[in-house]
Amino acid sequence: MPNRKVVKFFFDVISPYSYFGFEGITRHRSVWKTPIQMKPFFFAGVVRHTENPGLPLRIPIKEKYMHKDLLFSAQYWGIPFRLPKDYTNMMLNTSSIVPQRILVASQLRDNVLMEDVARGLWHRFYAYGKPIFTKSQVAEVLRDLHVKDVDELVMMSDSAEVKNILRENTDEAIGNGCFGAPWMHITDGHGKVLQTVFGSDRLPQVADFLAEPFKGPMREKKPNA
């Protein structure tokens, strides 16, 4: 009997751990039979809903550790990474609603395009320290990727359809207990959630639950920078 399980991967480009999880799970797609659905969502909406005051960046000793852990994790995944200047302030006070909506708009056009745009945004922010939070900043990434009809895609991000999809993705995650990013649902063939998973470091357990192989960082699969 074919494996009917599905992995839903919820992510926000403001989250560096979403970046690591995104790379890990998309690299494993080449060796897994289990379908993977990528779900851009709005992390700030999750934080507001859970009234979570315990973000690591608000606790100095956790913030210090997290900065080291991010570099350690990026090295493991083979991802060029450095913390942008004024990183803590940006993370706590900047909204990712614009890039997340543009990711949804990109996904409506083509799922591969959405993944390319997500990587481009992460690379701009976490490799070069450049902001990604306004339409003009995201448009620069789209043009660097030679995306067609950039202005049309950016305009599409303001549509009711896009806003509704992003809200639905966020509500779906929250409805199944989400409190952080990245977040995963493993469902059966009928959409019933069998397991929820938090964090980029849980891919070995995800693979085991799916009876799929875990191949480590698979650095040979990383896209060209």
UniProtKB/Swiss-Prot annotation:
Name the UniProt record assigns to this protein: Glutathione s-transferase kappa 2
Species lineage: Eukaryota, Metazoa, Ecdysozoa, Nematoda, Chromadorea
Gene from which the chain derives: gstk-2
Claim: Mitochondrion is one of the keywords in the record: yes
Species annotation: Caenorhabditis elegans
Stated role: Has roles in respiratory and lipid metabolism.
Tissue-specificity statement: Expressed in the pharynx, body wall muscles and epidermis. Weaker expression is seen in the intestine.
Keywords tagged on the record: Mitochondrion, Transferase
EC numbers for this chain: 2.5.1.18
Reaction equations catalysed: RX + glutathione = an S-substituted glutathione + a halide anion + H(+)
Molecular function, one GO term: glutathione transferase activity
GO biological process, one term: glutathione metabolic process
Transport among keywords: no
An annotated GO cellular component: peroxisome
Domain of life of the native organism: Eukaryota
